[in-house]
């Protein structure tokens, strides 16, 4: 029990376990009261010492457990918060990249549709040119 708690008096194991023995003469034929009282006092004092020590230990144990639980909770909360923040930053970055990619794909799709329309128009004009007569039909009569 070497731990000291601030605000409480220091106790040593020796102070709690020291007993002062008093020696007295016994009268023969009389029952010794000392033995009975000692047994009662021993039980009472050891119970008091044990209960005081157990209260002190339990109190100290409770404090240490609460402090450790708070420390664990804080570190777990900090870890979770940092993990969530870094994951959310990565998600935001990925989302921005996806938006840029989507915009690029939409622009490419629009450009491809315009190119397809232009190619179709060109094909129609080429077909018109090939099928039409450039020169009018000239009929030449033979002179006889």
From Swiss-Prot:
One of its GO terms (cellular component) is BLOC-1 complex. Residues 31-40 have a biased composition (Acidic residues). Keywords: Coiled coil. Residues 1-48 are annotated as: Disordered. Pfam families: BLOC1S3. Residues 102-133 form a coiled coil. Component of the biogenesis of lysosome-related organelles complex-1 (BLOC-1) involved in pigment granule biogenesis. Belongs to the BLOC1S3 family. Component of the biogenesis of lysosome-related organelles complex-1 (BLOC-1) composed of Blos1, Blos2, Blos3, Blos4, Dysb, Muted, Pldn and Snapin. This is Biogenesis of lysosome-related organelles complex 1 subunit 3.
């Amino acid at each position: 029990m070497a731990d000291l708690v601030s605000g409480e008096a220091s106790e040593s194991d020796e102070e709690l376990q020291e007993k002062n023995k008093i020696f007295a003469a016994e009268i023969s034929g009389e029952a010794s009261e000392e033995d009975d009282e000692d047994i009662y006092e021993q039980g009472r004092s050891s119970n008091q010492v044990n209960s005081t020590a157990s209260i002190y230990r339990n109190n100290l144990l409770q404090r240490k457990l609460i402090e450790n639980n708070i420390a664990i909770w804080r570190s777990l909360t900090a870890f979770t918060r940092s993990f969530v923040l870094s994951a959310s930053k990565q998600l935001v970055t990925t989302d921005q990249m996806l938006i840029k990619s989507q915009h690029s794909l939409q622009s490419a799709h629009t450009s491809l549709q315009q190119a397809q329309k232009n190619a179709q128009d060109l094909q129609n004009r080429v077909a018109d040119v090939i099928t039409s007569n450039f020169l009018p039909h000239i009929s030449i009569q033979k002179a006889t």
